[in-house]
């Protein structure tokens, strides 16, 4: 079995992640953010949580903060998000509902973090047609009568994106020039090191508010006023709706988002324009278009799709770790920690000789975000099973060891000369991502995929 340099780097990152957990946590539940061991132990841990069981923590505040910061670093966050209280009525629920629908679309198994190979089939053709899907997530109950729509382009964008961010209307500039159909979005919180691959505006159309007519709805990009006082708006996208079209309209905003990101001063807002097929201007409200100020959870919002730049993100993560290491050194280095004799991960070597089930294998490790008090910014999942690898890679290696050729040779040499060459290590050989839905500091809803977070298979390396 051959591994590329990138694979070894990924395995190294995961090994560091597991090492951090194993240094501090074990099935003894010294801190119940993490549960490890077999299924019975996990069930017992959950029962104790349900009974408000709270074991005495073995770690100091410093160690707790270090663990939290390391996990945030793995998640690509510089600090714990602290979203402000909800502003703007029900509009935020539109964005959250959409992201939750994307979360469900990805069909993530929260226990294993493994995405299903199946994809939803919207059944439509045009990129901005309306497709309705009833809500069963629970979040949509805030928006009575609201339906969520998929487009074919959107399904593809969701599956290819590493990060998806929903942007509600920026309330500071919500009603530009006193009209509910001109609005602005704050893209200042778009993450660094990620490239915009697609962006869309979602506007709700209520079929019950208008007569039996066809309308053309255009989205225009507003620009700074010229010397004559005019804005000279730029056409972005349009769609035609009929009398029975009810739901969220989707417009392509990729070019506008790229412009705003390159030139933040150019972001002066968007405008909706509605015309009859005869070319007559129609008030958008008369055509059933819901604008700013709606308190039924149907205000316009944007969704932006990103793909990460691995090199930039890896560099930023490395720099953050170096800064934190330097800070620790200035404060006197790493704090000493008493050995945890109850932690069977830390005492793996001594335990393995007494354990008949000693071979390298995957074991359960549950990471609980609620016990980190992160539920105020993490929407889903509440936790996930990360798993870890533990066991011996001793001679002779059997077929279940999933060993590399190098590990087999190393085992033979170790068997002949154990004092000169160590045994191969039991480590992850296959990893899979998880998807996390959370609020950022501006209470934008973010859906992000994190690679190499779940151990799918273990082997001797």
Curated annotation (Swiss-Prot):
Location(s) in or outside the cell: Secreted
Residue stretches of biased makeup (Basic residues): 318-337
Database matches in Pfam families: TGF_beta (PF00019), TGFb_propeptide (PF00688)
Basic and acidic residues: bias regions: 338-347
GO cellular component: extracellular space
Protein keywords: Cleavage on pair of basic residues, Cytokine, Disulfide bond, Glycoprotein, Growth factor, Secreted, Signal
First and last residue of the signal peptide: 1-30
Disulfide bonds listed in the record: 360-426, 389-458, 393-460
Main location: secreted
One Gene Ontology molecular-function label: growth factor activity
Positions of the pro-segment in this chain: 31-338
Subunit structure: Homodimer; disulfide-linked.
Protein name, UniProt field: Protein DVR-1 homolog
Organism of derivation: Strongylocentrotus purpuratus (Purple sea urchin)
């Amino acid at each position: 079995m051959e591994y590329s340099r990138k694979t070894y780097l990924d395995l190294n990152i995961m090994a560091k992640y597991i090492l951090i957990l194993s240094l501090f946590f074990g099935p003894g539940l010294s801190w119940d953010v993490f549960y490890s061991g077999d299924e019975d132990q996990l069930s017992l841990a959950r029962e104790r949580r349900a009974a408000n069981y709270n074991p005495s923590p073995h770690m100091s505040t410093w160690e707790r903060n270090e663990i939290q910061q390391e996990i945030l670093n793995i998640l690509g966050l510089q600090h714990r998000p602290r979203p402000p209280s909800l502003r703007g009525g029900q509009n935020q629920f539109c964005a959250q509902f959409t992201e939750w629908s994307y979360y469900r679309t990805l069909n993530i198994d929260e226990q294993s973090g493994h995405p299903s190979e199946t994809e939803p089939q919207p059944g439509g053709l045009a990129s901005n047609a309306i497709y309705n899907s009833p809500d069963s997530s629970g979040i949509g109950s805030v928006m009575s009568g609201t339906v969520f729509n998929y487009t074919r382009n959107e399904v593809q964008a969701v599956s290819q994106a590493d990060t998806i961010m929903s942007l509600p209307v920026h309330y500071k500039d919500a009603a530009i020039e006193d009209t509910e159909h001109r609005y602005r979005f704050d893209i200042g919180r778009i993450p660094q090191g990620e490239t915009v691959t697609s962006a869309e505006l979602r506007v709700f159309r209520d079929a019950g508010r208008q007569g039996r007519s066809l309308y053309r709805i255009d989205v225009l990009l507003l620009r700074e006023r010229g010397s004559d006082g005019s804005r000279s708006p730029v056409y972005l996208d349009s769609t035609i709706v009929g009398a029975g079209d009810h739901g969220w309209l989707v417009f392509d905003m990729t070019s506008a988002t790229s412009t705003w990101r390159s030139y933040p001063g150019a972001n002066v807002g968007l405008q909706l324009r509605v015309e009859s097929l005869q070319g007559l201007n129609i008030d958008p409200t008369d055509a059933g278009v819901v604008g700013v100020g709606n308190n039924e959870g149907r205000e316009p919002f944007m969704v932006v799709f990103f793909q990460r730049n691995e090199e930039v993100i890896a560099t930023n993560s490395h720099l953050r770790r170096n800064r934190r290491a330097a800070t620790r050194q200035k404060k006197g280095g790493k704090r000493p920690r008493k050995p945890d004799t109850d932690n069977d991960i830390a005492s793996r070597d001594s335990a393995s000789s007494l354990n008949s089930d000693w071979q390298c294998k995957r074991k359960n490790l549950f990471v609980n975000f609620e016990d980190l008090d992160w539920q105020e910014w993490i929407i889903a999942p509440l936790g996930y099973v990360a798993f870890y690898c533990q066991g011996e890679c001793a001679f002779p290696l059997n077929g279940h060891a999933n060993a590399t050729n190098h590990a087999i040779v190393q085992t033979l040499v170790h068997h002949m000369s154990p004092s000169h060459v160590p045994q191969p290590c039991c480590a992850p050989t296959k990893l899979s991502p998880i998807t996390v839905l959370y609020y950022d500091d501006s209470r934008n809803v973010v859906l992000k995929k994190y690679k190499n977070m779940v151990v799918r298979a273990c082997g001797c390396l």
